[in-house]
């Protein structure tokens, strides 16, 4: 992938950009095989990749510069701002949004937050696009509600310029730290969730719910999990750390009992909405801590699917699964190091199948799906 920002030394986020994709995949596969070298793996499936540019459905832009000439992008370690509107990871549909946002920031008087001086209001712009209908969700992350009335007043102009903006919110993040969002979310549109669709499964994205940033590869990840589950004799499963329900909604059948657990209430609201649309009455989604939920149960289903954050599922949940011994565990991981550590804590299981998903091209990161079977 050619990137003018990288070539000019202005951005180094894509550290592997000079390597062709096949070389990147080989290096990631070698890393994964090295991490799982102590475990016999019955089947290594071919890695899955997607487009090498324009694949991201989300932009997280630090706002800097002045109210008249805002910059959308990032800050270097020395505090120097860098405009990343031309980043080739973003689809072409993002360019007109960025172009309209710059004059809008001036119209609404949203002074960019100055980190060094701890002054200003507008900290971040967060943009998400739906692959199914091109609808977008835009979030303004502000330090306080001081400029909220001004923003509301100027908003009709922006909506006229960008009718694709279906959900618009203000998030209040008052702390002087590099934290992307605060707890308070103020909706400026009637619509509160963005409609998405993977493999004919309706999914919903709300402002404070996690959603994969590479839809082309994520949809293949969910479809693969569905195919693996359909090959197993499973009538009851848990989907732990379930997010908006992507895995569970793909894997569920009308006669399957499924419980999805996720700590974020916003994500659970999305999952429930999807389940209702699909008419799946035996699906239950709850906003709870996944480890606390599981370890409080006296019995387990035939299959437990886990999709934890980078830290992994951790020893307490590993110990519980080892003791309760569900017949199958499907582990989806964005950090193969912690997954390998967790698998070591599950000595009663063998690895039946592993597949790498190149969710993050041009970086060392990748997603991996692993099927563990009780010995």
UniProtKB/Swiss-Prot annotation:
GO MF annotation, one: rRNA (uridine-C5-)-methyltransferase activity
Keyword terms, alphabetized: 4Fe-4S, Iron, Iron-sulfur, Metal-binding, Methyltransferase, rRNA processing, S-adenosyl-L-methionine, Transferase
Reactions it catalyzes: uridine(747) in 23S rRNA + S-adenosyl-L-methionine = 5-methyluridine(747) in 23S rRNA + S-adenosyl-L-homocysteine + H(+)
Family annotation (InterPro entries): 23SrRNA_MeTrfase_RlmC, MeTrfase_TrmA_AS, MeTrfase_TrmA_CS, SAM-dependent_MTases_sf, U5_MeTrfase_fam
An individual GO BP term: rRNA base methylation
Keyword Transferase: yes
Residue numbers binding [4Fe-4S] cluster: 3, 11, 14, 87
The EC number(s) this enzyme carries: 2.1.1.189
NCBIfam families linked to this entry: meth_trns_rumB
Family: Belongs to the class I-like SAM-binding methyltransferase superfamily. RNA M5U methyltransferase family. RlmC subfamily.
Protein name: 23S rRNA (uracil(747)-C(5))-methyltransferase RlmC
């Amino acid at each position: 992938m050619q990137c003018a920002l990288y070539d000019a030394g202005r951005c180094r986020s894509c550290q592997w950009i000079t390597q062709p994709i096949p070389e990147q995949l080989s290096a990631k596969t070698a890393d994964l095989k090295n991490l799982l070298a102590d475990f016999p793996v019955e089947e290594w499936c071919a890695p899955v990749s997607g487009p090498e540019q324009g694949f991201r459905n989300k932009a997280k832009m630090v706002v800097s510069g002045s109210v008249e000439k805002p910059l959308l992008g990032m800050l270097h370690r020395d505090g120097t701002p860098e405009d990343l509107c031309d980043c080739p990871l973003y689809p072409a549909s993002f360019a007109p949004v960025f172009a309209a946002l710059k004059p809008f920031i001036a119209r609404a008087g949203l002074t960019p937050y100055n980190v060094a001086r701890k002054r200003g209001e507008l900290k971040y712009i967060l943009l998400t696009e739906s692959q199914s209908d091109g609808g977008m969700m835009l979030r303004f992350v502000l330090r306080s509600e001081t400029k909220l009335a001004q923003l509301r007043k100027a908003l009709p102009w922006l909506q006229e310029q960008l009718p694709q903006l279906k959900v618009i919110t203000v998030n209040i993040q008052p702390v002087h730290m590099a934290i992307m969002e605060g707890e308070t979310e103020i909706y400026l549109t009637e619509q509160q969730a963005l409609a998405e669709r993977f493999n004919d499964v309706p999914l919903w994205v709300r402002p404070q719910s996690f959603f994969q940033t590479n839809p082309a590869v994520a949809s293949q990840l969910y479809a693969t999990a569905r195919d693996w589950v359909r090959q197993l004799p499973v009538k009851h499963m848990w989907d732990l750390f379930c997010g908006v329900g992507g895995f569970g909604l793909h894997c569920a059948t009308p006669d399957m009992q499924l419980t999805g657990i996720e700590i974020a209430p916003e994500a659970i609201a999305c999952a429930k909405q999807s389940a209702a649309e699909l008419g799946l009455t035996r699906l239950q989604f709850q906003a709870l801590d996944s480890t606390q939920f599981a370890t409080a149960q006296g019995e387990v289903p035939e299959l437990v699917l886990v999709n934890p954050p980078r830290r992994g599922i951790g020893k307490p949940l590993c110990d519980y699964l080892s003791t309760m011994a569900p017949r199958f565990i499907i582990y989806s991981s964005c950090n193969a190091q912690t997954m390998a550590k967790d698998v070591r804590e599950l000595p009663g299981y063998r690895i039946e199948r592993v597949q790498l998903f190149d969710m993050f091209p041009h970086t060392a990161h990748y997603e991996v799906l692993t099927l563990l079977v009780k010995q």
